[in-house]
């Protein structure tokens, strides 16, 4: 078994009494409430209550291991399957954007992205939960990734030609450019890499795009579709509107899922209408081919990389008791400051000190209740992201600003990113210790501020880097009297809209190992840095952090997560 310390769990204050018994068939571990019986033949574990009633059992062992090696680190692709009755429901998994609540029979990919928060915990209406102790990209349900349309169907364009769909690209009338018509073998333009496959030099802003033709399933069953969109999009299948118009801003696309029963060999019309939003925009339609319904409806979890299968079974008399068990394992949430429960005022940044203080003063003069005002990003000099310094041309006296806020009986929460421009002293402090992710620097990735500046994110998996991150905040912001900390982009989102392989390159390798293995827990480590720093500095003051990403255990750092 691995000797690595779990990032998710906390040490337990007391041991639970248990007994161990063995027969020719199994080994049983029994507590006062639960028995776990491990088959000596298959390794299958069956969990029963004290009356012998089965609560959960693995599916004939249900374990799959595939040996892999990533960046010199050995591990396994892993999957665990449990049996599940038809009337079971599953909830949890974090915060996803596809309008799903009960995950029974559904599929969900667990990775971190702006507005997508992945938590490897699922709770059942049968009053148990599974905490999956793994930090890599994971999948609930089907372990396969979504396939392109041409891998699952025979595609025919609107003229009857096999091999793809007809893509019609109508430019904005203001461009005086001609319409482009071409064959698309699949609809997969979902990131900065794949949008290069769109028509060259075609301006998406203000255009209208249509993909149409027919598709023929190569097998019968329930097909699960995944629509990826930025801008406005509709989908018609078999001449029926199956996805009414949806919209998403181009810099942060979204996914939507739907499923259809289809028959092998049938010819089915397909039409996708897309109005891109922005100069770069994204769209995609992919699919999972059918698996047997009894397989689709089981409880199954897959992870890209781990040392072993490691999960916690939590049982209770009701869901509250299961959640209590989850808190016991991952850490209890400290009581947050009372003021944090009050009214907040926030906007896409106040640009000056006068705006912040003046806005708060207006609330007080109008006798509108308010407890917290929020300073969003870009209060620093334009070329000094990560300096944690106010731009004195716009915020001439930050200490007075905070004091003025406090004098009006309010609090200030400030946005802090784990991002640093390479020209800042803070970047250099991390970099010289090997605590800065290097890929963005090597590729000279410029961000969207001003002319664009090159920078990267610090490695929050390093304990030394955590301490340095807090020390920099303490020296430059904490001493002003800041009341709360808004941890933005803590996925970490080094760059928007990159493909998954490049995302991993941008946020690794970590101090603990390859980013493939440690992909989802960055926000947990980042929150730990600030929480432990604050507790050491001022143990008698309650902590409040707001973070854009989350993971199991985040609550123990007095952290709330917002929708991004």
Predicted regions and their residues:
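N-terminal accessory segment at the very beginning of proteins
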Residues: 1-154, 159, 207-208, 222, ...
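Aromatic- and carboxylate-enriched substrate-binding clefts and catalytic-loop regions
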Residues: 6-8, 57, 256-258, 369-564
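Beta-strand-rich interaction surfaces with strong enrichment in secreted/lumenal proteins
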Residues: 17-18, 198-202, 212-215, 257-262
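Edge strands and adjacent loops of beta-rich recognition modules
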Residues: 94, 180-206, 328-330
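Predominantly extracellular/luminal regions of secreted and cell-surface proteins
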Residues: 150-193, 316
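Extracellular beta-rich ligand/substrate-recognition surface
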Residues: 196-209, 244-253, 507-509, 513, ...
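Aromatic-lined ligand-binding clefts that engage carbohydrates, nucleic acids, or primary amines
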Residues: 215-235, 270
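Short, acidic/polar
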Residues: 351-365, 465-475
